[in-house]
């Protein structure tokens, strides 16, 4: 079994959300998908026009469906852990919108040469995480593929009047990040055996942790905007929030939580290609303080798998929200910045 575990991450070219389409390539594809104004369904409350985390479709005045799908290649050598992380990552999009997950459909690509016991462990990990979220597996789909892939399509519910989008940040708000960054660097390092499974444990725990607590607490207190940090990295998803909200974000580089060993690995150029793709696409919208070195700069573009929530909340409620999250969560959230006015003297993202 140990040999099989170590093979798992060797069976694909990329790891997790680092294997997503680059932002440039995705933009080229999506520009051809145009929905004419007269064809828009008024019940589709949230679509893909602002790069939000999930789609939201109104069913009645007090209920809407939240729908999302996410799957990817292995981010851990242990099949069960991979299943947990993949499910947590998919569920996160519903949590980011302030929704409650209800049902899930498994999506699995698998080669019969690997062994059915490995797939069974992956599905078990996913099932346990979905159960932890209070959702139910309703079915799934499998297909033969040389690369192992697993993920989940999730359906949740939300009150239409309480949808939290990535485009509601307000000037004066405080920014809270609920998980440390660096998972892309660490999964890459594990894949090429720069680090051991023991050194990967922090990243494994962070990625397998549901964003349930952060979501529940932000719904209780009321927030302006939220998104989860995944394949486009902290800067990419922060930019989507800023652009969608028509504001600028000022982020303190010293406040951003980063997992252990990440910067040392980046110094050795051990990071996924997705970090460079993110940098290429988003750098024109970012201003960096001169004090920030290249290692730190690249780390902020690192594509995350099952990353934390980036929450924009009124400054008068920020400390209370932070305390409420941290009282319940082993992984500590941090205040990392604030929302400011976008003007001719700044850019949408300003790292100080």
Regions found by a protein language model. Name each.
Residues 1-352:
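Helix-biased detector of long, well-ordered alpha-helical tracts
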